[in-house]
């Protein structure tokens, strides 16, 4: 994948760029693997906004991605197509299994049309193959990693993501996540070999607000720029800093909100670097 830069023909074009989509081999999805995706506009079943800055955007269909693959152990599959997915930053690969089944998976780097992939404990260590962590050599780069055995891939699914298997002790494997955190994961959990493709995604310059609106992202307005009726930070004579701890429009504390005594914290070997310690 590469990045195509636009010439500055208009203010919105100046500096903006777009993916060149050279790896895409098919423009329409497999009909049997798509489902309707109605827009919610960031609202719940009562109509209340639960996620701000969402609304509008282009219509989408949801592509069903196989994040487990355990039911296809030992069954070879050919990569029929590499496709664009509007619901994620990574590309997706359409697999045609020898038993006639069709499935989508996250497309790893260096996987191309016509390649063969497989799943199972005896699969080769090559991009696109899915194995339990106990069968993957230490030092291997993986993606689409399960947190619980059989629970489906939860980590390392976005464009360019890679997780390294750094050690294995007893029933746990130690993984270095993209954030720098090192975490214990059950060796029965499965992972896919290789890093996620489309790594240049993070270098795209969207150029104008309108392109974000096409994606369904609405403007983010600072609370201190609002009136008191709209936000606890609003109002004041002239420019003010808010005068209180950061809160959301409902008055609830914002910022560092991660629970320090989360049950899964015991599996963290080394925390990710944050704030002043991030170097």
Swiss-Prot record:
Its ancestry begins with: Bacteria, Bacillati, Actinomycetota, Actinomycetes, Micrococcales
Q: Report whether Ion transport shows up as a keyword of the record.
A: no
Q: What is this protein called?
A: Large ribosomal subunit protein uL2
Mind telling me which GO cellular component terms the entry cites?
large ribosomal subunit
In terms of Pfam families, this protein maps to:
Ribosomal_L2, Ribosomal_L2_C
Q: Which GO terms describe its molecular function?
A: rRNA binding; structural constituent of ribosome; transferase activity
On subunit structure and binding partners, the annotation says: Part of the 50S ribosomal subunit. Forms a bridge to the 30S subunit in the 70S ribosome.
Q: Where is this region: Disordered?
A: 1-59, 224-279
Concerning PANTHER family, the annotation shows: LARGE RIBOSOMAL SUBUNIT PROTEIN UL2M (PTHR13691:SF5), RIBOSOMAL PROTEIN L2 (PTHR13691)
UniProt lists compositionally biased (Basic and acidic residues) regions at 253-268
Q: Which GO terms describe its biological process?
A: cytoplasmic translation
> Known Gene3D superfamilies for this protein?
2.30.30.30, Nucleic acid-binding proteins, Ribosomal protein L2, domain 3
Q: Which UniProt keywords apply?
A: Ribonucleoprotein, Ribosomal protein, RNA-binding, rRNA-binding
* Family, per entry: Belongs to the universal ribosomal protein uL2 family.
Which NCBIfam families does the record cross-reference, listed alphabetically?
rplB_bact
**Biased composition, Basic residues: where in the chain?**
50-59, 269-279
Quote the function comment for this protein.
One of the primary rRNA binding proteins. Required for association of the 30S and 50S subunits to form the 70S ribosome, for tRNA binding and peptide bond formation. It has been suggested to have peptidyltransferase activity; this is somewhat controversial. Makes several contacts with the 16S rRNA in the 70S ribosome.
